[in-house]
Amino acid sequence: MSEHPLAQEVLSRLSGVPQQKFQDFSTLTEQMKSSQYDVFGEGKKSLALSRFKGSFLKKCPGVSPGMVCCNYYVVNLSKNCIYDCSYCFLQDFLGNNPMQVAYVNVEDLLVELEEVFTQYPDRNFRVGTGELTDSLALDTIIPYTDYLLPFFNR
């Protein structure tokens, strides 16, 4: 993963921060769960860079029978959050996985979006990026906006 261009950019921005390589960061998560009182707080101190496997673009999780779809979709380029907002549902929702994870294969997302948008040229898509994180919280470290803004601004 450290060979990926976005991973290299992130790691260069964090050059003074200790770094570890893991085949599976669930090992670190389990280690954290067994040794920390405030697992969620401890998870905010770490950032795992990973490759997202699967489809990035998901239908709105609020779609249910009898509801009219407004073509809202979500893209999760990362999960968890560095903030500690007491009102946020992520405090409980992601409690079983406290690790802050950022996916670096943004080019796969852009290819997927291009394919879907090309397949449905007459459909308006609304795409949000903040379902499982504050999507701008780490933008100075993980510059997702450098990729997404030019794509959506065309």
Language-model features: locations:
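A short N-terminal interaction module
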Residues: 1-28, 39
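Glycine-/small-residue-rich active-site loops that bind phosphorylated ligands and cofactors
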Residues: 2, 80, 136
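A structural signal for short, well-ordered beta-strand segments and their strand-loop junctions
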Residues: 20-21, 74, 86, 128-129
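N-terminal [4Fe-4S]-dependent radical SAM core
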Residues: 26-77, 92-99
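Conserved Radical SAM active-site core
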Residues: 50, 54-66, 90-154
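Short cysteine clusters
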Residues: 81, 85-88
